[in-house]
């Protein structure tokens, strides 16, 4: 049986549940059941690569087989094919859990992928699910709490999720209820399915070594040439999903790389909103873009301080390395490093606290609701409709060309730009790079694309060095205030060296821009 599943999932903590219990949606009659699910795939993970998951779960005394599709681009709805196994296929001589019933998959997208292939268990999910129903704006919503564990090989990962699933009515009611719940606890949408998490854990379990961790599910550029709106949905939805996963990881581990990846995801979302603006801009577009930028800005201070800490830890020029031979300089450096670490911890605490405020989770939900509603597809603007029907290559090529012209026009004046203007140029370079990565597939020019991206990366890195140098005096003085008299000597040296190194950094950036000018665009 084919169904369409529409749901919102949230990662929660025990403290969140205590706060949420005051809401009527979690205060009514409930049922509880233990659900043990086994997920199957071919040895080469053909279903995973196709964005499908095949599950066997024990429900009400019988096995139910469910094939789920991935999330549609920019949509919370997922197709699923359910089949109750009356006479489950079993391996001869074995009385353990059944194997998937292949005949029930005959008319599904999985059929050609598993034909002639052996199916084996990839991972299992064991949760206790508490369920209740709630009415919101005329819709019936199932409110479920899953508490349990995900297992793959020798690895385990805890599960504690709140799930809102629309059983009937308007999907907008899901967001109305979610925003109401977010007033009580910092709900953060989880756009990665349990199956995706299971596959990541299974990949980690297949690795060796003591530091195995679930792998990040890397974004891959569009492999085909989808329609313009589908491409936008895929890029924006993935960027938002990466943002939510990176925040959960940042809360748990407070890693600098995670902080960086979260900022990258938000910048990529902003780049997609601007790049596809002529096709999707509506009355909410500016508000959605502002919400994404607000989330990114909450991380800026912590990232800036981390980059400064890395510079000081590694040394900042020959003068600093020579000064470390003197005892006074070594003590000054140690005091300064301690101060910068305290500054970084405080900035990260402030950022995480800001994400725990209702405004942050509501901002993410506003973006998600806008993507799900896709009101731009119902526009009466003839020009916008025409842009939406263009092939991706026809839509994106002039946009890439315009971005490139702007980058080079400003880059030609690099030496006369202020630090803030150079930073704006770097943001333009990033937008061009993200667009080139995400939308290069329709042009089928891998060599030219690679050379163009390499040139862009060099410009971005060179401008990044300039940005770091410009920020050094301010950060050095702040660190000196935090460190006290011990850190003043080295802070002054750091500020002076940053100023002295700027001319050489400017020359490197100018050379990188000249190389970009000669890099042949892949879209012409």
Residue map of PLM features:
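Cationic, histidine-enriched alpha-helical/coil surfaces that engage anionic ligands
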Residues: 1-524
């Amino acid at each position: 049986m084919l169904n369409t599943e529409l749901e919102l999932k949230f990662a929660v903590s025990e403290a969140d549940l205590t706060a949420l219990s005051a809401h009527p949606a979690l205060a009514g009659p409930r049922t509880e059941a233990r659900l043990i699910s086994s997920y199957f795939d071919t040895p080469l993970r053909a279903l995973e690569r196709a964005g499908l998951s095949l599950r066997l779960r024990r429900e009400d005394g019988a096995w139910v087989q469910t094939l789920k599709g991935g999330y549609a681009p920019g949509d919370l709805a997922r197709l699923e094919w359910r089949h109750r196994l009356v006479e489950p296929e079993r391996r001869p001589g074995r009385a353990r859990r059944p194997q998937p019933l292949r005949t029930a998959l005959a008319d599904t997208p999985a059929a050609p992928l598993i034909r002639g292939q052996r199916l084996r268990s990839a991972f299992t999910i064991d949760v206790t699910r508490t369920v209740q129903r709630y009415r919101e704006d005329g819709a019936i919503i199932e409110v479920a709490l899953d508490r349990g564990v995900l297992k793959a090989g020798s690895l385990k990962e805890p599960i504690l999720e709140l799930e809102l699933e629309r059983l009937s009515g308007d999907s907008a009611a899901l967001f109305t209820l979610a925003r109401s719940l977010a007033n009580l606890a910092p709900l953060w949408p989880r756009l990665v399915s349990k199956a995706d998490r299971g596959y990541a854990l299974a990949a980690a379990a297949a690795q060796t070594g003591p530091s195995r961790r679930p792998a990040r599910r890397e974004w891959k550029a569009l492999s085909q040439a989808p329609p313009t709106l589908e491409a936008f949905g895929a890029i924006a939805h993935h960027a938002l999903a990466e943002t939510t996963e990176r925040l959960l990881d940042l809360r748990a581990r407070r890693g600098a790389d995670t902080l960086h990846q979260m900022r990258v995801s938000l910048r990529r979302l902003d780049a997609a909103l601007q790049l596809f603006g002529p096709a999707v801009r509506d009355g909410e577009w500016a508000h959605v873009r502002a919400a994404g930028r607000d989330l990114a800005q909450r991380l800026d201070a912590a990232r800036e301080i981390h980059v400064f800490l890395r510079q000081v830890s590694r040394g900042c020029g020959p003068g600093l390395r020579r000064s470390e031979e003197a005892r006074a300089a070594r003590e000054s450096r140690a005091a300064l490093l301690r101060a910068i670490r305290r500054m970084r911890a405080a900035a990260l605490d402030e950022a995480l606290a800001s994400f725990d405020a209702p405004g942050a989770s509501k901002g993410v939900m506003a973006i998600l609701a806008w993507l799900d509603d896709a009101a731009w597809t119902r526009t009466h603007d003839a020009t916008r409709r025409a842009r939406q029907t263009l092939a991706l290559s026809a839509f994106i090529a002039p946009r890439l060309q315009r971005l490139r012209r702007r980058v080079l026009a400003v880059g030609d004046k690099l030496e006369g730009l202020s630090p803030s203007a150079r930073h704006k140029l770097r943001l333009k370079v990033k937008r061009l790079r993200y667009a080139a990565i995400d939308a290069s597939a329709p042009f089928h020019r891998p060599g030219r694309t690679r050379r163009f991206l390499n040139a862009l990366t060099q410009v971005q890195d060179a401008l990044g060095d300039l940005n770091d140098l410009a920020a050094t005096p301010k950060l050095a003085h702040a660190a000196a205030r935090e460190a006290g008299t011990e850190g003043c000597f080295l802070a002054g040296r750091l500020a002076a060296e940053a100023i002295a190194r700027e001319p050489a950094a400017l020359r490197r950036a100018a050379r990188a821009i000249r190389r970009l000018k000669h890099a042949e665009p892949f879209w012409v």
